């Protein structure tokens, strides 16, 4: 095409991407259970895609409570940060840039992967009949019904915000070029946005402004933890 600029550089905040091809986040479930540490295979996967202008990692948990899928990675322990740093270094060595997508699955989870075997948190105790992915005794992926959720307490909401902020700091420590906050697709932040799953009557429920509050609080906390140029 006469005016094709796909392979031209583009500015992203304070950073320059070498082209305009962006790899979207795709869940691979290639982490070690139960520590949620990314494997060498995950590192190879991202390294192979470093020729794009920007790699966005698969959704990555901000805490053990944020976990919903067996095999999904985290970025909240030292071992996880160390593993991610090796992956990031390999992408950078090939001239690529990489950001980590941060998530909390909320009700899309199962008690078997939750701390102390508790029910997963959500905005309210609304069971929407979703399924998630676990592993059987042969380490094979299996689909199961999610455990019906419980409403998050205000203290738990504060902890979620703090977990996103700490995960942002951890991403910076691992050398990532930024973080992307996952606020869609029916996961925790989205569950607070939607009236079907948010039936709260406190400052996080009711009006549109209140239902947006958790997402905005999370973004503010992530920006405070790093800066606005590195948070999306």
PLM segments and residue spans:
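Structural preference for beta-strand elements that scaffold enzyme active sites
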Residues: 20-22, 54-56, 97-99, 178-180, ...
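Alpha-helix-loop-beta-strand connector modules within alpha/beta enzyme cores
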Residues: 73-99, 194-231
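Acidic/aromatic-lined carbohydrate-recognition and catalytic surfaces
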Residues: 20, 59-116, 154, 159
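Conserved, mostly hydrophobic/aromatic
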Residues: 23, 49, 91, 100, ...
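N-terminal amphipathic alpha-helix/helix-capping segment at the start of soluble metabolic enzymes
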Residues: 1-25, 50, 91
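Non-globular sequence segments
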Residues: 103-170, 174
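Catalytic domains of carbohydrate-active enzymes, especially glycoside hydrolases
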Residues: 42-63, 174-178
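Short, acidic/polar
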Residues: 36-49, 159-169
